[in-house]
Amino acid sequence: MNTKYKPIYKKFLRLRENITGTKKIKLLKKKKTKLNKFLNHSLYQVSKNAKSFKNFYKSQLIVKQKVKLYYTKLSDKQLKILCKKASVKGNLSDRKKKFDLLIGLFENRIDTVLYRSNIVANILMAKQIINHGHVFVNNKKVISPNYFLNPGDLIEFSHKITILINKNLLSKKISSIVPSYLEINKNIFKLYYTSNLSFDKLLGFFPFWLDLNNVISHYNK
């Protein structure tokens, strides 16, 4: 059975958390009984007699599922490759370096960068405009959402979507913050990727607690 169009709120129900931080889920409150329970649920207390290993594995699994859902359905294989790559490049004893490398593999993707810049409402919309050929990096068309950016890259857009971009920028709250490694010119719709990022600077941009240590250790068994 194809699960591509499965309602996303059902995945939130399993994880007991609104992973994407979207406000649209609240609009369904009156229509969905289960969703209403989800929005008003209280965290249960773990039994003192619970097995520590079982709880540890469960916590690892939940964090992994949150990351996969937040970055729009990353496959288990893709996430495993990224974690292995971060572990190989970084010193196994240097936790901060591993975290910076892994978060860079997530956030340096062009679809994620467009989302962080507030140019699009979500990562799925970013993937769509990229696949349709509306995004250019250093004057070259990019059609792969997996394209990795480097410091100094200039991102531009086709004139066909300038109205959409302007609408998205205006709909964002004034308090919406763009990460320090991005500079956006709202007048000519150009985006500059200025410098490398770090995990510490991105902690406040996630609507949930991102425990990268659990994610990495899950695949380094």
Q: What residue ranges belong to the model's regions?
A:
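Short, well-ordered loop/turn sites that connect or cap secondary structure elements
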Residues: I123, I129-I130, V135, L149
